C-alpha cells in the first residue's frame, strides 16, 4: 500500500506511527485491500494530510466514514472525485454556501481546492469496504484520527473546527476551545438538514470572518 503523506505531518505524528495499535491497523488495512475492494484507492488514504500541510491548517472539518460506492471517495471527507454526482450531504453543503456566500453550485464535488487552501478534511475512519458502510470502524483509525485532532489543538492556534452532527460534535472534547474557534451545527445529510438543523448555519461566512479577524487569508469556498 502506497502511503502518501506530506512530510510536515511526520514529526507531529511519528509517536503514533510507532505504537502497536497503528502497526496492527496498517496490517489490517493491507490485508483488506489485498483481499477485498476498498475505498479510497490505497494512494489516497492519506490525501487529507497530503493536500493540507500541517503548517497550513486553518480549518478542520470532521467526517465519519469514506463513501463506499465506486469511484466516490478520494480521501477527503465529504469530497468526491471529479465527474461523480454530488452525494446528498455534499449537495447540501454547496446549497448552504450558495445561500451564505452567494456562490453558485460548483461543477465538481472534488474538495481538493479547499484542502489546498488549508481546510483539513478528516474522516474519523480513513478506509471502508465497498458497499459496507462502517466496515473498517473500530480497527484503530478512530484512535489515530483522535490523536491527529489533539495534536492540531495542542500545536496550533486560531484553527476553526467545523463540527457537523452528533458524531463530530463529540470531538469537541479533544479541542482546546480557549485558543481555537469551534462551530457546531446539525449534519448536512437530508435527514438532519430537512429538519432544520443544517441550513442557515452560516458556517462558511463565520469561518472567514474569524480568519479575517486573526489576519489570516480567508477560504475561497
Curated annotation (Swiss-Prot):
Principal location listed in the UniProt entry: cytoplasm
Catalytic center residues: 65 (proton acceptor)
Localization: Cytoplasm
Catalytic activity: Hydrolyzes single-stranded DNA or mismatched double-stranded DNA and polynucleotides, releasing free uracil
Any one GO CC term of the record: cytoplasm
Its EC number(s): 3.2.2.27
Pfam families for this protein: UDG (PF03167)
Keywords: Cytoplasm, DNA damage, DNA repair, Hydrolase
Keyword DNA repair: yes
One example of a Gene Ontology biological process annotation: base-excision repair, AP site formation via deaminated base removal
Similarity comment: family membership: Belongs to the uracil-DNA glycosylase (UDG) superfamily. UNG family.
Free-text function comment from the UniProt entry: Excises uracil residues from the DNA which can arise as a result of misincorporation of dUMP residues by DNA polymerase or due to deamination of cytosine.
Name of the molecule in the record: Uracil-DNA glycosylase
Organism in which the protein naturally occurs: Flavobacterium johnsoniae (strain ATCC 17061 / DSM 2064 / JCM 8514 / BCRC 14874 / CCUG 350202 / NBRC 14942 / NCIMB 11054 / UW101)
Amino acid at each position: 500500500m502506497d502511503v502518501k503523506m506530506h512530510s510536515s505531518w511526520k514529526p507531529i505524528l511519528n509517536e503514533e506511527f510507532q505504537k502497536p495499535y497503528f502497526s496492527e491497523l496498517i496490517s489490517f488495512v493491507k490485508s483488506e485491500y489485498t483481499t477485498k475492494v476498498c475505498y479510497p484507492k490505497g494512494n489516497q488514504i492519506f490525501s487529507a494530510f497530503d493536500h493540507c500541510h500541517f503548517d497550513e491548517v486553518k480549518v478542520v472539518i470532521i467526517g465519519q466514514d469514506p463513501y463506499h460506492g465506486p469511484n466516490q471517495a478520494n480521501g477527503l471527507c465529504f469530497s468526491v472525485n471529479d465527474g461523480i454526482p454530488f452525494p446528498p450531504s455534499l449537495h447540501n453543503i454547496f446549497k448552504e454556501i450558495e445561500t451564505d456566500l452567494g456562490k453558485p453550485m460548483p461543477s465538481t464535488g472534488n474538495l481538493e481546492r479547499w484542502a489546498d487552501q488549508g481546510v483539513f478534511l478528516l474522516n474519523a475512519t480513513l478506509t471502508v469496504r465497498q458497499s459496507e458502510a462502517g466496515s473498517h470502524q473500530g480497527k484503530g483509525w478512530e484512535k489515530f484520527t483522535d490523536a491527529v485532532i489533539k495534536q492540531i489543538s495542542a500545536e496550533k492556534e486560531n484553527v476553526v473546527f467545523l463540527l457537523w452532527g452528533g458524531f463530530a460534535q463529540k470531538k469537541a472534547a479533544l479541542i482546546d476551545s480557549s485558543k481555537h474557534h469551534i462551530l457546531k451545527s446539525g449534519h448536512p445529510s437530508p435527514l438532519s438538514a430537512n429538519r432544520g438543523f443544517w441550513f442557515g448555519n452560516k458556517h462558511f461566512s463565520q469561518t472567514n470572518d474569524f480568519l479575517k479577524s486573526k489576519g489570516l487569508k480567508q477560504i475561497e469556498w
